[in-house]
C-alpha cells in the first residue's frame, strides 16, 4: 500500500505539520488586531486569543449618547474578532495546503 519508507515519511510529514501548526497557533495568540466602527471613531485592539488590549474612543463621541457609544464599542470588538478569524483561516490554509479542518479540530487528529 505504501512504498518503501512511505508510512515513515507520511508520519514524519504529519509531525512536521503538527509542529508548524503549533507554532502558528502561538503566533496567532500573540498577534494584535484592531477592529473599528463609526468610521474609525471607535477602535478596539485585541490579541489573537481575544483578550482586549486597548479601547480607543474619539473625543467627539464623549458628548453623544451612551447607548450609541456602547453599540460602537461592541461593533468594533466584533470587527476585530472577525479579522482574527480571517487571519487564522489564511494562516492555517498556508500550512494545510488549503485542507479545511473542522472548527475546533487541532492537529494531531
Swiss-Prot record:
Q: Does the keyword DNA-binding apply?
A: yes
InterPro entries tied to this protein: YbaB-like_sf, YbaB/EbfC
Q: Does the keyword DNA-binding apply?
A: yes
Q: Name one GO cellular component term.
A: bacterial nucleoid
- One Pfam family, please name it: YbaB_DNA_bd
Any one Gene Ontology MF annotation carried by this entry is: DNA binding
Superkingdom to which the source organism belongs: Bacteria
Where is the protein found, in the record's own terms?
Cytoplasm, Nucleoid
Keywords associated with the record: Cytoplasm, DNA-binding
Q: Which residue ranges does the record annotate as region Disordered?
A: 1-22
* Binding partners and assembly: Homodimer.
Task: Tell me the function of this protein.
Answer: Binds to DNA and alters its conformation. May be involved in regulation of gene expression, nucleoid organization and DNA protection.
Family assignment from sequence similarity: Belongs to the YbaB/EbfC family.
Q: What is this protein called?
A: Nucleoid-associated protein VC_1055
Report the source organism: Vibrio cholerae serotype O1 (strain ATCC 39315 / El Tor Inaba N16961)
Amino acid at each position: 500500500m505504501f512504498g518503501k519508507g512511505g508510512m515513515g515519511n507520511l508520519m514524519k510529514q504529519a509531525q512536521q505539520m503538527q509542529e508548524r501548526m503549533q507554532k502558528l497557533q502561538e503566533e496567532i495568540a500573540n498577534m494584535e488586531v484592531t477592529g473599528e466602527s463609526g468610521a474609525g471613531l471607535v477602535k478596539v485592539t485585541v490579541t489573537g486569543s481575544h483578550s482586549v488590549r486597548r479601547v480607543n474612543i474619539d473625543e467627539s463621541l464623549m458628548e453623544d449618547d451612551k447607548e450609541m457609544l456602547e453599540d460602537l464599542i461592541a461593533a468594533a470588538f466584533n470587527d476585530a474578532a472577525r479579522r482574527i478569524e480571517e487571519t487564522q483561516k489564511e494562516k492555517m490554509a498556508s500550512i494545510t495546503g488549503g485542507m479545511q479542518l473542522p472548527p475546533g479540530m487541532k492537529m494531531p487528529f
